[in-house]
């Protein structure tokens, strides 16, 4: 949404700062046809090390209708031991866990692979800029494995590991029939 363009830029910049603080040697905001991408990379310095590409997104669903919120959606709150905030479950919470795990491994000297991060700002509207961004930056995004945390869980009490994704599929079905019974 164009009305939130500045908010999206601030959010992207904050993620860039967090990735730099976590230990990435290169971080940048990269323009696209829509909201910018956040790119960061860490090179471990070991020859022939594999590269992990971490994908996430920083956009969130619209806050409306406000009356359905039990607390201010713009301020995080904890109720019954759970965190409630915009994007806490899709996908900022998962992204923060990945960044903090990366930060720990780097600062403890345990990171033995190269890591690249790519965070987009349009996942909630179907990622219209993602395909062209990947095409334009194919070499930059090259990796041995991709880590995505924006997946489903079997249930609220059952953590899950998704081992493969195949993309999005859209259908439009038109049904016609007789004009009378």
Task: Tell where the protein language model's regions lie, with residue ranges.
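N-terminal helical capping/dimerization or prosegment-like subdomains
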Residues: 1-66
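Short glycine-rich loop/turn motifs
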Residues: 34-38, 71-73, 170
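Beta-strand secondary-structure signal
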Residues: 39, 116, 170-174
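Active-site metal-coordination/substrate-binding segment of hydrolases
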Residues: 49-119
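Short glycine-aspartate micro-motif
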Residues: 51-53, 83, 144-148, 170-172
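Acidic/histidine-rich catalytic neighborhood of metal-dependent amide-processing enzymes
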Residues: 89-164
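Flexible glycine/proline-rich, aromatic-decorated loop/lid segments
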Residues: 162-176
């Amino acid at each position: 949404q164009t009305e939130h363009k500045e908010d999206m830029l601030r959010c992207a910049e904050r993620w860039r700062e967090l990735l730099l603080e976590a230990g990435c040697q290169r971080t940048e905001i990269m323009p696209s046809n829509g909201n910018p991408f956040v790119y960061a990379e860490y090179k471990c310095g070991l020859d022939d090390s594999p590269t992990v590409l971490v994908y996430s997104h920083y956009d969130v669903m619209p806050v409306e209708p406000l009356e359905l919120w039990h607390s201010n959606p713009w301020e995080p709150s904890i109720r019954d031991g759970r965190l409630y905030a915009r994007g806490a479950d899709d996908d900022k919470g998962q992204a923060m866990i990945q960044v903090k795990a990366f930060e720990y491994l780097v600062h403890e000297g345990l990171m033995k692979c190269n890591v690249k991060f790519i965070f987009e700002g349009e996942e909630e509207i179907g990622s219209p800029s993602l395909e062209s961004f990947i095409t334009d930056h194919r070499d930059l995004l090259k990796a041995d494995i991709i880590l995505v945390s924006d997946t489903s869980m079997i249930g609220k009490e059952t953590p899950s590991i998704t081992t493969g994704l195949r993309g999005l599929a859209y259908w439009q079905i038109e049904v016609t029939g007789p004009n009378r019974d």
